[in-house]
């Protein structure tokens, strides 16, 4: 008894069917005699931010320079350029679109930026979360360095974080990857970006995209609710308060009102002989609103 098997590409025919079984030689197979291969262990993730930050020979100036020039470095990434940085006594090699691997010093762009953020925050004496003790502790970094006045985080400035603001250097691409050492800060900053997404003009397809990087880091530590409890929701709330405190509003409405006040002050200082009808009408409309 012959038998036909239909699939998306056509029909396969077997000559005989005996007791419900087809003889393998009756159907042409593309892959046969399967041979087992051991799993590729290159997928093991060797990256550890905390371990790298315990390395000797910090070149912290490179971290400040990298965040300052992050726009140029990001363009290099977009152009698929591999980059190398001397952050320690060994090089950090940055490969665009890199997947997790066994190497400790070959990283993706976002992880490299997280490393720079971590170095700077260590230098700024931020406390580090100890997962074993479930609390924040002093970091033991003793590096003595005064950053150049020219160093700045342009992305943070555009979001209202001045150079004096505690989170000026933290608000950068890849901050989510500092979760192992700054979990409350990462969660609070993700909450800030989500809640201020319109003001910050963040582009996204779905709201979940705004917190997805943070969620991936949280779930590495366990159940979301449990991790939140370990870190401490009260602590997360305090970190959020720190983020929004003394931040300059960048809302267009606020800035529009501010500039109108300045315009009115200037208007009052202009000699009446220089005031044409156009500018008078403009200010009459403003005062009449």
Swiss-Prot record:
Keywords: Acetylation, Capsid protein, Virion. Coiled coil: none annotated. The modification N-acetylalanine is found at residue 2. It comes from the Viruses. The keyword Acetylation applies. Its main location: virion. It is found in: Virion. GO terms for cellular component: viral capsid. Signal peptide: none annotated. Belongs to the high plain virus capsid family. This is Capsid protein.
């Amino acid at each position: 008894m012959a038998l036909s098997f239909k699939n998306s590409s056509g029909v396969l025919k077997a000559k005989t069917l005996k007791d419900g079984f087809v003889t393998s030689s009756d159907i042409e197979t593309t892959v046969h005699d399967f041979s087992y291969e051991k799993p590729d262990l290159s997928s093991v993730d060797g990256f550890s931010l905390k371990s790298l930050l315990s390395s000797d020979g910090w070149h912290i100036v490179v971290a400040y320079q990298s965040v300052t020039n992050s726009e140029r470095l990001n363009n290099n990434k977009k152009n698929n350029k591999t980059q190398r940085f001397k952050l320690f006594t060994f090089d950090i090699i940055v490969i665009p679109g890199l997947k997790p691997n066994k190497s400790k010093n070959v990283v993706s762009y976002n992880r490299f930026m997280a490393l720079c953020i971590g170095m700077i925050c260590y230098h700024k004496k931020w406390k580090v979360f100890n997962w074993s003790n479930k609390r924040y502790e002093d970091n033991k970094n003793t590096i003595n360095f005064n950053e150049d006045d020219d160093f700045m985080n342009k992305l943070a400035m555009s979001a209202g974080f001045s150079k004096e603001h505690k989170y000026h250097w933290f608000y950068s691409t890849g901050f989510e990857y500092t979760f192992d050492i700054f979990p409350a800060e990462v969660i609070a900053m993700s909450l800030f970006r989500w809640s201020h997404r319109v003001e910050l003009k963040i582009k996204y397809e779905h709201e979940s995209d705004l917190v997805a990087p943070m969620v991936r880091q949280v779930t590495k530590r366990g159940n979301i609710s449990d991790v939140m409890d370990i870190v401490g929701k009260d602590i997360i709330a305090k970190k959020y308060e720190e983020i929004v405190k003394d931040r300059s509003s960048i809302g267009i409405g606020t800035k529009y009102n501010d500039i109108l006040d300045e315009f009115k002050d200037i208007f009052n200082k202009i000699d009446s002989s220089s005031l044409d009808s156009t500018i008078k009408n403009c200010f009459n409309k403003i005062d009449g609103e």
